[in-house]
């Protein structure tokens, strides 16, 4: 059994079923009880976590995908999915499509994107939402602001010294997109 909370990957052993309940023994942590409830998976409340219900991911991930890939694809689809129109910036008037698998089309200079969800990239963006945009494997961090149907993408300006961890602050606006 494996899962991630965005900060660490947690592994454990799935132990036998007792009256419809599976026990997951996480190494270095307490155990959790899992039980199917119709189409949902129910995690019983424990010492460190409340009761949680999980649905099967509607967007399948390829075999061998990293931990968290189902969540990431569902988030990308719900938050970024659909058609966007560039209302200001390079490519004005073009339609942009953000895909659940991290592909992007129609945004000049980018063929892939990734939202910063946790870890170092989150700590480097000073509380701002950030994303990675790249083309042909080369890319940069960007700050973004989502307000309803508007998505503003700003340059990420590094205010750290060369020997420090980057600290990104919002710079000039590169694009303004509107969800269609």
Region locations from a protein language model:
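Low-complexity, repetitive regions of proteins mediating host interaction that are extracellular
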Residues: 1, 59-68
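Contiguous, well-ordered beta-strand patches that form the walls/edges
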Residues: 1-40, 88-95, 104-179
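N-terminal start-of-chain detector that recognizes signal peptides
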Residues: 15, 56-58, 68-70, 124-126
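Short beta-strand edge/turn micro-motifs at domain boundaries
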Residues: 42-63, 83-85
């Amino acid at each position: 059994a494996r899962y991630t909370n965005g900060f660490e990957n947690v592994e454990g052993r799935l132990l036998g079923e007792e009256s419809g309940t599976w026990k997951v023994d996480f190494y270095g942590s307490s155990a959790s009880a899992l039980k199917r409830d119709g189409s949902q998976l129910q995690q019983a409340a424990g010492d460190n976590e409340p009761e949680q219900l999980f649905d099967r991911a509607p967007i399948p991930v390829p075999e061998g995908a990293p931990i968290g890939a189902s969540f990431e694809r569902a988030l990308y689809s719900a938050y970024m999915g659909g058609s966007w129109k560039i209302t200001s910036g390079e490519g004005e008037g073009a339609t942009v499509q953000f895909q659940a698998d991290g592909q992007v089309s129609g945004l000049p200079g980018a063929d892939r994107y990734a939202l910063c969800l946790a870890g170092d990239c989150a700590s480097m963006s000073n509380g701002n939402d950030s994303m990675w945009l790249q083309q042909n494997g080369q890319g940069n961090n960007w700050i973004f602001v989502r307000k309803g149907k508007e998505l503003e993408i700003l340059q990420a300006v590094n205010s750290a010294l060369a020997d420090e961890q980057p600290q990104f602050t919002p710079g000039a606006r590169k694009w303004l997109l509107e969800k269609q």
